[in-house]
Amino acid sequence: MKIVILYRSVLKMKYCLIIIVVLLMNVTALYAQDPHFSQFFEAPLLRNPSLAGLFAGDIRIQGVYRNQWGSVTTPYQTGSFNIEYKQPIGKANDFITTGLQILYDRAGTTNFTTTNIYPAVNYHKALNGEKSRYLSLGFMGGYVQKRIDRSKMTTNSQYGPNGYNPALPDGETFTKSSYHYWDGSFGMSYNSSINGSETDNFFIGFAYHHFNRPLNSFYKNPPVELNPKWVASAGVRFTASEVSYITIQGDYSKQGNYTETIAGATYSVKIGDDYQNPLYTLHLGGYLRVKDAFIPFLKLDYRPFSIGFSYDANISQLKTASQGRGGFELSISYAGFLDRGNTTKDAVVCPKF
């Protein structure tokens, strides 16, 4: 009987080790890398602070929630909230956008939790008198806290001759279950209409995150710096018909040895009698995170509100363990005018992704 029990235990441990190895191949970087969203365009400040304010109106509020890997381990949960307010500068065609970005991420059985609070500012410099070309420079920086629930940790120091014993010390040398640091990012973007169109436009931008290289570890020695992250973003929107348009966009990011490429397209259909200012717009699209996931996307605009859904169909090495299931995302946003006296902002024909 003991041999049978031991054999079953070995098989169970072998299966667990396979799962762990596959996970490590895919997610080791998560504790050292930034969380990501498949609906990356619904968290513009996390892409690039200089993308703040690229919308029709003077105020925008956005929220994104992501739930990932519930079929393999404790679900990874990530939430983003941002608010932006845009206003003109003097009598010129320049604008300034101020905002706030909050990011919450919880991962793993130890509830490894990260909370980021970032004020942001973005200056939009008009490059012509028609308000059709802008160069934007943005900055974002603030406070970051990371913490774990140490009572849920399991280490090899807690295994004895009789198996796992939670009463044994975990053997880790850090004394505090949380730490914090200050973080900063900046970016630049260029956006323009296409041939003077008020609906067809494009943008390109570059951002540099964590430029101050904050210390990112529960341990004091050796010190571990958070790798800076470069992000290149681009997008174009063009008319497909009187009632529809297509948006193509993507991001490439590099942080340490980790790189990520995500890109795709959305087909948007205006619904209603007024095609210039439709009450409803339906968006259908698909995105690809290279070597990781295919992402179908659905969004409905009911001005001034929007709600979007996406789902990651896993195509990475984790596909077998996750049974192809990845992450679900829900986004909700509002974009409108807080001050009706600022309606001239709608005349800025820069991209409104």
Feature annotation, model-predicted:
Residues 33-353:
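Subset of outer-membrane beta-barrel
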Residues 1-34, 337-353:
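Cleavable N-terminal export/targeting peptides
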